Amino acid sequence: MADQESDKSIEIWKSFKLIKGLESARGNGTSMISLIMPPRDQVARVTKMLADEYGTASNIKSRVNRQSVLSAITSAQQRLKLYNKVPPNGLVLYTGTIVTDDGKEKKVTIDFEPFKPINASLYLCDNKFHTEPLNELLESDDKFGFIVMDGNGTLFGTLSGNTREVLHKFTVDLPKKHGRGGQSALRFARLRMEKRHNYVRKTAELATQFYINPATSQPNVSGLILAGSADFKTELSQSELFDPRLQAKILNVVDVSYGGENGFNQAIELSAEILSNVKFIQEKKLIGKYFEEISQDTGKYVFGVDDTLKALDMGAVETLIVWENLDINRYELKNGATGETVIKHLGKEQENDQSNFHDAESNAELEIVEKMPLLEWFANEYKRFGCTLEFVTNKSQEGSQFCRGFGGIGGLLRYQLDMRTFDELSDGEVYEDSD
């Protein structure tokens, strides 16, 4: 199933698209209401405030503007009636009359609970929607794990934004190397190795305890940094005792001069650049894995809109990879003559070709029932196909190659699939209903 990290990045992307759409909307006069309520605010307080605002707005001299403002306040009041209390993450409400691209007026009302708590309170009537407070939703709150390990002990910590937290630390008393000769030398060496092994095992077990969420069995951090002054950190990273789910999350192994909290601070400084580029690194890793499947011709990959959608329908896609600026729209078209509905995915050039909006056999015109960016459709529907959805940029070399060479859409599959077989089947129209 889709992991939490992937879900969160999709929510951020949805919020970004919504904010951009709201930002560009404009209205006549001051008939556009922006209302943001933080968690634990009272619906009754805002309802009373809107009633007071209604009284004030009744005195606006311009009849057209007065009616627009009163209409927007009424819409806000009606929408608030749907809520008994403010949702746990707060409530965002935008309502008013906007002017569309072709100069027509259109009423819009958008209300939603943000995907994480919003710490802002706002009420404004203007000729635009105010989305500035929503920008905090777009800020990454990725959490990173740190394991600082040396010959004296280990510290487990996390870093999220500028907040660092020490989860646990313990000390260890390891025997030092010494020059005693004779038969005791081997025994001492064996004891020393045994204690080292136990130390690494304890650290590995605690790492699983702190950095794996027991509810999801997935890491609760976006990445791991291993730090230390001796070679314990390297030993841990390569150890079979270290949880493979965490091994996959290692971003960096750094040398620090100290152990404990001083070592933690130094590790944060030394990893600053890597942490700021973590999305970039994850993207390179993901697309690198995709290219590896292709170069080895494993059959566990798919690319292009049609093949990717076929594989999705079969439940074969484990990770759906899509360029964040993919410019393809999903059309639901209806044949007026037969009542049949078809789905088409068209790019800009294809949209200009009118033959795509006519039935190939009868030349009957196809009516547009729904038009939606394919990206948006994926963001809403991906969970239905049991896959994770990853948006990638074209800023890395790998990302650019994925967009140019593979059309910016593809997937890693759960099992081997030869899409050519399916193309031949569909060409032969084997999928026709027998009844």
UniProtKB/Swiss-Prot annotation:
The keyword Thylakoid does not apply. It holds the Pfam family eRF1_2. GO terms for molecular function: translation release factor activity. The modification N-acetylalanine is found at A2. GO terms for cellular component: cytoplasm. InterPro entries: eFR1_2_sf (IPR042226), eRF1_1_Pelota (IPR005140), eRF1_1_sf (IPR024049), eRF1_2 (IPR005141), eRF1_3 (IPR005142), Peptide_chain-rel_eRF1/aRF1 (IPR004403), Ribosomal_eL30-like_sf (IPR029064). Keywords: Acetylation, Cytoplasm, Growth regulation, Protein biosynthesis. Transmembrane segments: none annotated. It is found in: Cytoplasm. The keyword Thylakoid does not apply. SMART domains: eRF1_1. Heterodimer of two subunits, one of which binds GTP. Directs the termination of nascent peptide synthesis (translation) in response to the termination codons UAA, UAG and UGA. Modulates plant growth and development. Plants silencing ERF1-3 show increased elongation of the leaf petiole. Belongs to the eukaryotic release factor 1 family. NCBIfam families: aRF1_eRF1. This is Eukaryotic peptide chain release factor subunit 1-3. It comes from Brassica oleracea var. botrytis.
